[in-house]
């Protein structure tokens, strides 16, 4: 939508000729502008997007042009379908941006055109009422146009005002009736009051529910119109045109409120040329999430849905996580020969972390659909998504059923299906499947020139879990040779996997040969990384096996005092302050130059109520500041002193 608006703004600023050529698009822009201005909840959501400033600047730039645009439209006598198409397109782009999966309410394209017929007296199919109204009375035109635009802007997120309810409407109708009964009024005054009364309905949240009630507002308005027809000599066509417009609005308000019975009843009272078509009725059932009524309607009416409609059905069922209905629809689509888009499966399972109920059934139905025609790479992506969910939930039986349909490992390497190969490596780690492990082990080296980085780490994790030392070292050497200059995080990952998955003798030998290439540049930060993974023992194992000189290790911690402080804080929290103190003693950390580390230990020791740790902190302070014990009231660590006195 923003691209469309940007295109309009650039063209409008560059040449005035564009305004003549592209009035429909310009009108669409101004209509879209009005849509967002009047719907505060929607504009709030839209303006939170990254490009909100761009849209706001466009709104400001053309805020004064909407009147000019409407004036241009009045003089625009070309095909209204072009205008309708542009308006519909930009409106639906708004909906798509706000509801990426399932727009609950969309004004159907037929409604756009029907409403425009009532606002454009230059149309060849023009009716007598609009021509009479718009050719003579500008005030009435504004009222009706305002009402029409409010219908065009309907959306489920719009929190419509409830300040004008049925009592106010009834009072307005009574005024209207008394005015018409006074024979002194003319046609213009009568129509103006009627239209202003109708305009109040847009504020009434119970509009559709009170419509068919006896002596409800519609019947009062209808009675009023009949009275006006007699007293002001309005012809029957004018009255029928007005009644048709009113029924159109009732129908779509009912649909907006999810009241299908009222919607269909109002629709049945409309002329066949304006009433919903069979396909539009199917759209209504979909919009109301009435899946079984939708299926029944399609079968009874023998409808062949468009590709766009099929897309909407799939997105609706996927976003609702309705696996049972989705399976039925997939099989139904296959039997009818309707196309199925794989992208919906991929996008849905990538965006939803929790697996849907009966997902194996959905996958089986999916395989049933694509058994004769599918893209192997796309199929692997979908299989990877399903398999990863099954692994997450430890559903081994479902994994085995899915693996029956997976291509051979060698073919997956040839097709570069690393999304699925990554998940298969994880499957081996979780379920210790020796057969799949052997197939991956036999094939990866033949295709290692194309292997991505994330798959290398999956291989390393798999080799470590299966205790395949030589395979692990081969993959590690290949990765080091390929990357040459490893970043810090890659060094941490490789060291941790190496210490976890390979026996100490081979690790020590590997460090002796290639250790300098994977050595962490920041040793305290590496310790923090290991602690984050709950693998502190492997960090200590690294110091023992790496062959680093003790003086070098001490210098690393001295030169990275901030990271050392962070490490001591994590150690105190996870392992206790006594462990942190022992660690400081091992590395001979110079507390003389940095009492922030003591602060960290003191803080956690107080929370632990650990007097041994508090005493150690006090002893260190005594050593750092001689004479501190003689002046405890001015101590650097007052909390520590209080706890020791207790």
UniProtKB/Swiss-Prot annotation:
Top-level division of the source organism's lineage: Eukaryota
Gene Ontology CC annotations of this record: mitochondrion
GO biological processes: mitochondrial translational initiation
Subcellular location: Mitochondrion
Keywords of this entry: Mitochondrion, Translation regulation
Main location: mitochondrion
Observed phenotype of the null mutant: Decreases mitochondrial respiratory chain complex III assembly. Decreases RNA level of cytochrome b cob1 and may lead to abnormal folding of cob1 protein. Abolishes growth on the non-fermentable carbon source galactose.
An annotated Gene Ontology molecular function: translation activator activity
Subunit structure: Component of a complex, at least composed of cbp7 and cbp8.
Protein purpose: Translation factor for cob1/cytochrome b; plays a role in cob1 mRNA stabilization and required for correct folding of the protein.
This protein's name: Cytochrome b translation regulator cbp8
Biological source species: Schizosaccharomyces pombe (strain 972 / ATCC 24843) (Fission yeast)
Gene that specifies this protein: cbp8
């Amino acid at each position: 939508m923003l691209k469309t608006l940007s295109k309009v703004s650039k063209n409008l600023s560059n040449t005035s000729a564009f305004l003549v050529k592209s009035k429909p698009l310009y009108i669409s822009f101004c209509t879209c502008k009005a849509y967002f201005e009047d719907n505060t909840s929607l504009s709030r959501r839209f303006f939170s997007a990254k490009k909100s400033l761009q849209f706001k600047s466009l709104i400001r730039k053309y805020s004064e042009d909407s009147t000019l645009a409407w004036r241009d439209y009045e003089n625009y006598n070309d095909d209204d379908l072009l205008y309708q198409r542009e308006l519909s397109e930009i409106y639906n782009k708004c909906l798509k941006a706000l509801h990426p999966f399932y727009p609950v309410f969309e004004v159907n394209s037929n409604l756009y055109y029907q409403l425009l017929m009532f606002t454009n007296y230059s149309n060849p199919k023009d009716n007598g009422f609009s021509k009479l109204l718009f050719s003579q009375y500008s005030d009435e035109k504004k009222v009706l146009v305002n009402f029409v635009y409010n219908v065009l802007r309907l959306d489920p997120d719009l929190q419509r005002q409830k300040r004008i309810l049925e009592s106010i409407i009834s009072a307005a109708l009574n005024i209207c009736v008394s005015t018409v009964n006074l024979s002194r009024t003319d046609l213009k005054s009568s129509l103006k009051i009627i239209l202003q009364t109708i305009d109040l309905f847009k504020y009434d949240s119970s509009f559709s529910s009170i419509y068919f009630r006896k002596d409800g507002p519609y019947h009062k308005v209808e009675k009023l119109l009949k009275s006006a027809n007699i007293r002001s000599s309005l012809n029957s066509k004018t009255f029928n045109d007005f009644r048709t417009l009113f029924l159109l609005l009732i129908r779509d308000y009912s649909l907006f409120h999810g009241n299908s019975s009222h919607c269909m009843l109002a629709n049945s009272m409309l002329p066949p040329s304006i009433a919903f078509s069979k396909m539009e009725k199917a759209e209504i059932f979909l919009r109301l999430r009435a899946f079984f009524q939708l299926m029944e309607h399609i079968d009874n009416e023998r409808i062949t849905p468009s590709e766009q409609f099929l897309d909407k059905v799939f997105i609706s069922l996927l976003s609702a996580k309705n696996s049972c209905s989705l399976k039925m629809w997939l099989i139904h689509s296959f039997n009818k020969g309707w196309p199925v888009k794989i992208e919906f499966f991929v996008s849905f399972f990538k965006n939803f972390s929790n697996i849907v109920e009966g997902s194996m059934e959905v996958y089986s139905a999916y395989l049933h659909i694509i058994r004769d025609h599918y893209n192997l790479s796309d199929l692997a992506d979908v299989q990877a998504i399903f398999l990863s969910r099954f692994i997450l939930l430890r559903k081994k039986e479902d994994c085995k059923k899915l693996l029956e349909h997976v291509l051979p490992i060698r073919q997956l390497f040839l097709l570069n299906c690393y999304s699925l190969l990554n998940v298969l490596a994880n499957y081996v780690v979780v379920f210790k499947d020796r057969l799949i492990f052997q197939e991956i082990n036999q094939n990866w080296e033949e295709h290692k020139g194309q292997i991505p980085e994330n798959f290398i780490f999956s291989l390393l994790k798999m080799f470590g879990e299966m205790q395949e030392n030589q395979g692990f070292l081969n993959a590690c050497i290949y990765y080091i040779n390929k990357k040459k200059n490893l970043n810090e995080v890659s060094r941490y990952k490789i060291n941790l996997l190496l210490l976890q998955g390979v026996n100490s003798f081979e690790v020590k030998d590997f460090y002796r040969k290639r250790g300098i290439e994977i050595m962490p540049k920041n040793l305290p930060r590496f310790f923090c990384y290991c602690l984050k993974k709950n693998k502190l023992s492997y960090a200590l194992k690294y110091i023992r096996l790496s062959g680093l000189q003790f003086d070098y290790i001490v210098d690393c911690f001295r030169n990275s005092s901030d990271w050392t402080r962070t490490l001591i804080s994590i150690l105190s929290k996870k392992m206790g302050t006594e462990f942190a103190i022992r660690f400081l003693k091992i590395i001979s950390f110079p507390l003389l130059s940095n009492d922030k580390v003591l602060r960290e230990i003191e803080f956690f020791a107080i929370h632990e109520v650990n007097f041994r740790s508090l005493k150690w902190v006090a002893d260190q302070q005594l050593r750092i500041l001689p004479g501190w014990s003689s002046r405890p009231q001015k101590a650097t660590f007052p909390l520590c002193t209080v706890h020791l006195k207790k």
